[in-house]
């Protein structure tokens, strides 16, 4: 079978989510042929792995803590032209590649092109419209996002929604699946072996901001605060220099989940894929949503009983030290709450089965 993936190029989370689904499909369909249409981060991520077609996408102007709605629209004022150009590009690709199904992650042009050519489509996205509680804070930005998501939910043959803490279920053509993660913790080596191989004598605090610059102020604050704690910190995927001996700064590496498995706790932004892996691996987390990013506000609303939530805008050395000291006292409580979430199988396994069922109809 042939599978065309149309994936947003914003951030790493969508890349890792779809790669996990692709790997499951390749295990189940040995003759599968994969093609990906994408841009930005995802294009660089997949360029040595699968055949690619370049499309255009939204541009986000990274700042230290927040998404500026005005700057996003200024940067993307001509996106409507890119949107229709993308549809044309994807339609040509569909006619040439002739996929059995089009799988789309957060890029509505893929659904529009598939519908125009009467191709089966599956939309994968974590926006649960039953849990949107922040409309009044985002204005036209929210309107644009919700219109796009509703269009895809309406016109796709099936919709796959990976959960965080919601109950996996089926509602019509919407399939709520387990969190989609890169690899199941049971498939990794045990913590003792990993700690020995990675060179740690005690479980570290893992810091990750997902490859964006939005959390750089947080990272710099942690670098300043680390010397006050008898903890080992790993700052993952950011090119910075440590200011104390208890901080290790690592570039982006493919074995992130090994570091996650041995970690004592995690400090992170509120990206869906990162939170999915944190919850699946049963780790206490101190979470900072990117200001004005609707998706991350939805995410923290879903996990607020299972992690400590704070605010990037208010971060300072003193406020972080107070917050982190309090967090350390509650790590056992948050770990206990994450263990109440009974995930058994990786959501990518479920998603691949749903896609294959749609293809076989």
Language-model-detected regions and their locations in the chain:
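Conserved nucleotide-sugar donor-binding subdomain of glycosyltransferases
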Residues: 69-101, 108-109
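A donor-sugar binding/catalytic signature common to diverse glycosyltransferases
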Residues: 101-106, 123, 255-298
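Donor-nucleotide binding loops and adjacent catalytic segments primarily
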Residues: 22-24, 182, 188-265
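A nucleotide-sugar donor-handling region in carbohydrate enzymes
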Residues: 139-204, 208-213
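A short, glycine/small-residue-rich beta-strand->loop->alpha-helix junction that serves as a flexible
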Residues: 7-19, 213-216
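Conserved donor-nucleotide binding/catalytic region of nucleotide-linked donor-dependent transferases
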Residues: 310, 315-343, 361
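Conserved nucleotide-sugar phosphate-binding/catalytic loop shared by glycosyltransferases and other
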Residues: 5-9, 27-28, 32-83, 315
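Short amphipathic alpha-helix
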Residues: 15-26, 41-42
């Amino acid at each position: 079978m042939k599978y065309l993936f149309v994936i947003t190029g914003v951030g790493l989370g969508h890349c890792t989510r779809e790669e996990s689904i692709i790997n499951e499909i390749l295990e189940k369909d040995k003759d599968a042929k994969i093609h990906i249409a994408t841009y930005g981060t995802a294009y660089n991520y997949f360029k040595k792995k699968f055949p690619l077609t370049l499309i255009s996408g939204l541009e986000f102007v990274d700042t230290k803590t927040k998404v500026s709605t005005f700057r996003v629209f200024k940067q993307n004022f001509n996106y409507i032209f890119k949107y229709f150009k993308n549809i044309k590009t994807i339609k040509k690709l569909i006619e040439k590649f002739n996929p059995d199904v089009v799988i789309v992650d957060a890029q509505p042009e893929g659904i529009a092109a598939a519908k125009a050519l009467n191709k089966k489509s599956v939309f994968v996205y974590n926006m649960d419209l039953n849990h949107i509680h922040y409309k009044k804070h985002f204005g036209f930005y929210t309107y644009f996002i919700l219109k796009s998501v509703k269009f895809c939910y309406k016109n796709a043959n099936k919709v796959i929604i990976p959960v965080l803490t919601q109950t996996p279920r089926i509602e019509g053509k919407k399939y709520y699946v387990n969190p989609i993660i890169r690899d199941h913790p049971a498939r990794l080596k045990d913590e003792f072996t990993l700690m020995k191989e990675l060179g740690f004598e005690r479980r570290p605090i893992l810091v990750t901001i997902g490859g964006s610059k939005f959390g750089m102020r947080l990272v710099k604050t942690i670098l300043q605060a680390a010397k006050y704690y008898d903890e080992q910190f790993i700052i993952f995927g950011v090119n910075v220099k440590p200011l104390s001996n208890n901080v290790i700064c690592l570039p982006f590496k493919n074995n992130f989940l090994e570091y996650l498995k041995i970690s004592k706790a995690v400090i992170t932004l509120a990206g869906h894929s990162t939170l999915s892996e944190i919850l699946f691996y049963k780790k206490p987390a101190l979470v900072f949503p990117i200001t004005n990013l609707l998706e991350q506000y939805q995410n923290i609303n879903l996990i607020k009983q299972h992690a400590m939530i704070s605010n990037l805008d208010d971060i300072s050395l003193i406020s972080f030290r107070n917050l982190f000291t309090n967090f350390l006292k509650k790590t056992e409580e948050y770990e206990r709450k994450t263990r109440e979430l009974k995930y058994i199988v990786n959501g990518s396994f479920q998603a691949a089965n749903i896609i294959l069922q749609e293809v076989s109809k």
